[in-house]
Amino acid sequence: MPFFDEAASNAWVPSQNEVAQRWQKKVAEFDGYIFVTAEYNRGIPAVLKNALDYAYPEWNKKPTAFVGYGSVGAARAIEQMRLIAIELQMAPTRTGVHIQGADFMSVWKGAKEITELSYLQQNATDMLDQLVWWANALKAARERPTVSAAA
């Protein structure tokens, strides 16, 4: 996907880039999302931010959950993702999965199996339960007719 080079967000004007249009259609197909991210220099990778910026209405009123890996389990990157998700009118889950740097490296190098990281199972289960609950609730809400606050 090219770097964002549109006149404005597709919340305001349609994207001109064909790749962006295909991405927006793909994003619109889903009722919720799980983002897996590393943490680089205390933030999310630029390509992830770029992908998020290329869509707007397609993310709205949908839940999202986060899995991160890095020296502090990508805690700072995931906090940034939560802020971005809220701006995109998404509902982030409270629980995420944070894979600590030493654990990630042990699994990556083959010294451990990911199943040996017992703390991940409960966090993953909680995160997925929250994501499914929000996905069901928000899908039902999106399918109902909109009621004005003035009503």
Locate predicted features:
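Rossmann-like dinucleotide/phosphate-binding beta-alpha-beta segment
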Residues: 87-91, 132-137
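Short, glycine-/small-residue-rich phosphate/pyrophosphate-handling segment
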Residues: 60-108, 116-123
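N-terminal beta1-alpha1-beta2 submodule of the flavodoxin-like/Rossmannoid cofactor-binding fold
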Residues: 1-37, 42-50, 54, 112-125, ...
